[in-house]
Regions:
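Surface-exposed, charge/polar-rich loops and edge strands
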Residues: 1-171
Length: 171
């Protein structure tokens, strides 16, 4: 297992990355904040959390300002109805971990379902400038209330590079 260092200082999303650009390496795993409103909701099936548990996650596309957006993992799909009073017109403050896009599909794309956590799979649904990667939300709040729900933890990444041993080098 590979240890991932997480920077817990909260920085504004637009101070570490920009829409339509690859996430700079120094921005990965930073704790970021963003304010916007959710304009679309998706189910992301077969996601694996930090404990190795497979479940479906709720992912929203958050519009930030007038012309950009980022995917936000809000929590478990099974808890998506916990905040029925959230409307698309409401501004939401999100804090969470900035994570690189997934590159392998976990499911098929279908209406309301995304195959992986990657803004590339929603480009046909919006003309907004999309940020690379996604925010794994640790907290969400509106002007007057904190949105309480279970939060998911980042998947532990496995190194795919095979090891070399001295006996292999001596032949």
């Amino acid at each position: 297992k590979v240890a991932t260092t997480i920077d817990t200082n909260i920085v504004p999303l637009d101070s570490v990355t920009s829409p339509r650009e690859a996430i700079p390496a120094k921005a990965l795993n930073k704790t970021v904040s963003a304010t916007g409103h959710y304009i679309a909701n998706f189910r992301a099936p077969n996601q694996i959390d930090g404990a190795g548990k497979v479940s479906d996650w709720e992912v929203a596309l958050m519009q930030i300002g007038t012309n950009s957006a980022i995917l936000v993992v809000r929590g478990l799909w099974s808890e998506r109805l916990l905040n029925p009073d959230i409307q698309q017109s409401m501004n939401i403050d999100v804090t969470g971990l900035l994570v690189a896009s997934q590159f392998g599909d976990r499911a098929e794309n279908a209406p309301g379902v995304i195959s992986r956590l990657d803004s590339a799979v929603v480009t046909s649904l919006t003309d907004l400038d999309l940020y690379d990667g996604y925010i794994l939300a640790t907290s969400e709040s509106t002007r007057d209330q904190k949105l309480e729900r279970s939060r998911v933890t980042p998947e532990k990444l496995q190194s795919k590079i095979p090891g070399f041993y001295w006996q292999h080098l001596s032949y």
